[in-house]
Amino acid sequence: MGVAPVSNQPLVAQQPKGIIDPSTGKPIGSNDAFFGEINNELADKGFLVTSTDELINWARTGSLMWMTFGLACCAVEMMQLSMPRYDVERFGFAPRASPRQSDVMIVAGTLTNKMAPALRKVYDQMPEPRYVISMGSCANGGGYYHYSYSVVRGCDRIVPIDIYVPGCPPTAEALLYGVLLLQKKIRRTGTIER
């Protein structure tokens, strides 16, 4: 026994609910002539019309506060990144000592089983949205000490990792490239879902 349609009219998709049209990915009304005219008038006067998500992501990439979780020799390269030769603060990437004030945690070095709960505790103290950069072979997968009984084989078993920086130890340029990749990733992602 089937259910017969009530009328022979074609089904019409409902109007999208929200700001973004799911079929195009653009704001609702962006192809409207009225809004296009306003956008063109404001562009001539030096204004920029954008979505709030893009504005928040742009601001977030220019003000990333990082804290160190230096566990071994990779931390020396991480310190070198803050020195005048590379001056990572010009990219809006400034160090902070407290996890409650930082957005990014750089895990650099060998993570042991005894240190893993402390890493998770510090990660949980960071405000959302929070990002983690895993720096060096030891943090990425255990490195040279991979088969030791006391080493965690990658800090991604304890906290979610956003950027992996390979090397033993990775150079400051490699970490700087990882920071730039993180900023690019933040620009791509939405503000609510991560």
Swiss-Prot record:
Cofactor section: [4Fe-4S] cluster
Database matches in SUPFAM superfamilies: HydA/Nqo6-like
GO biological process: one example: electron transport coupled proton transport
An example molecular function term from Gene Ontology annotations: iron ion binding
Cofactor binding: number and manner: Binds 1 [4Fe-4S] cluster.
This protein's record includes keyword Transport: yes
Location(s) in or outside the cell: Cell inner membrane
Entry superkingdom: Bacteria
EC number per UniProt: 7.1.1.-
Keywords, alphabetical: 4Fe-4S, Cell inner membrane, Cell membrane, Iron, Iron-sulfur, Membrane, Metal-binding, NAD, Quinone, Translocase, Transport, Ubiquinone
Membrane topology: Peripheral membrane protein
Residue numbers binding [4Fe-4S] cluster: C73, C74, C138, C168
Enzymatic reactions: a quinone + NADH + 5 H(+)(in) = a quinol + NAD(+) + 4 H(+)(out)
GO CC annotation: plasma membrane; respiratory chain complex I
Coiled coil: none
Family: Belongs to the complex I 20 kDa subunit family.
Described function: NDH-1 shuttles electrons from NADH, via FMN and iron-sulfur (Fe-S) centers, to quinones in the respiratory chain. The immediate electron acceptor for the enzyme in this species is believed to be ubiquinone. Couples the redox reaction to proton translocation (for every two electrons transferred, four hydrogen ions are translocated across the cytoplasmic membrane), and thus conserves the redox energy in a proton gradient.
Summary of subunit composition and partner proteins: NDH-1 is composed of 14 different subunits. Subunits NuoB, C, D, E, F, and G constitute the peripheral sector of the complex.
Name under which the protein is recorded: NADH-quinone oxidoreductase subunit B
Organism: Rhizobium leguminosarum bv. trifolii (strain WSM2304)
